[in-house]
């Protein structure tokens, strides 16, 4: 018994009538300009015919036209495909970029354009919004936390716009107005801010009365946000700006400032979303402040990872890496000048990192004078624009810029400790510059440790101090004279690290050994530190790199040994 041949797949015989957004959502479109659904969601409404006209290409772009600039195209024989003139329903990267580059009317430029599909309504219903709202403190407490956030965490990396956040904050008192976007704006801010070590008493009293610690509350908030954001990924819903902001804030406020080991996974995720899902890197200042500043904040965090933690940059090797801010990003001259100087420091620091790992010794020495000149000019501007002990907000910016400055200068010279004596013609001067930079960095951070702790930068400051002390100890072996009071600083750092870091797998013992080794190198004639643990046979420099999860070329850059 013969079976009937399978039915041929029916091809679309007419051009799609719905707009691109409605077709992607698989909902009915009323074909207006814009359609009612796009107008309601304040999204760009574009039809296939409009996109084709703008691109000035054939009736429908084919796969080959969009995937490659090659003139060679695949031809299908008529007997295989009898409908060779049928138009395929395909929209390639050119069409997507047309949507990205679409500009709104001038009266809409101040609002943040949305390039992503909103979450399914099943995740935006009242039940989900209510479950998120229940995690928020009362309005008065939330307001104090938000104000603290903009005075501390948002100063260095401006991820959020204060006016937008305040609008979401005001919706707390109006449940009918509180939305999914409001929740995903406020909750990451609150979760990050309540992790600060020096919270005001009114905030601490609220959490004590609620029977929960701020850290536990932060953990619960992050778990809920993860649950909902992962549901969106499962349903192939592209995250909107609130998801990108959440990832950036975690990358900066948690992984960067409060973790010793491991890759900054949230930074990796935010880069992925910002490049492959919602391509912020293609957006310029011409579209609007509130879109471009997210990419700028991401580039700053990437630069800080490279300079302060000496990790390879993800973005700065790319042509889209940007560290120069635009004036329209900021509401005041102080913030703009701060990020202008920070961008210059990070740009110089990243360039130093690249040179250390790509040039030979002789070529790198030829660039020392140029880097020194750049850093000196930046230091003059820092002293002129931000030294103001009477204003704590301005003074914190001053201290932070000086911390980045001295770290960049340490990074400029630290590679030379890996070379044997006699290789450098001016070894005494170079080692002296490194040792002096280390001492200046340590003195700055120790003297300003209180304000750094208040602003959430205690762990980063302690790590920079340990690194500088380690390098100063190596400089002493090469003839540099170190001050006599560094032993007390080493003991203080060890006590503070034990207080704020939870060690596991014997890391506390190994960490203490590294600090005792540093102290013994700085002051070889003094007795060992009290409560010393048994000595280990491990190489202290390798042990240091392992504790802080640095790569093996942290102390011995392979490119510098290739002479």
UniProtKB/Swiss-Prot annotation:
GO terms for biological process: positive regulation of transcription by RNA polymerase II. It is found in: Nucleus. The keyword Glycosyltransferase does not apply. Residues 19-45 bind DNA. Its main location: nucleus. One of its GO terms (cellular component) is cytosol. Coiled coil: none annotated. Disulfide bonds: none annotated. Keywords: DNA-binding, Metal-binding, Nucleus, Transcription, Transcription regulation, Zinc. Residues 56-78 are annotated as: Disordered. Residues 64-75 have a biased composition (Polar residues). One of its GO terms (molecular function) is RNA polymerase II cis-regulatory region sequence-specific DNA binding. PANTHER family: OLEATE-ACTIVATED TRANSCRIPTION FACTOR 1-RELATED, TRANSCRIPTION FACTOR DOMAIN-CONTAINING PROTEIN. This is Uncharacterized transcriptional regulatory protein C3H8.08c. It comes from Schizosaccharomyces pombe (strain 972 / ATCC 24843) (Fission yeast).
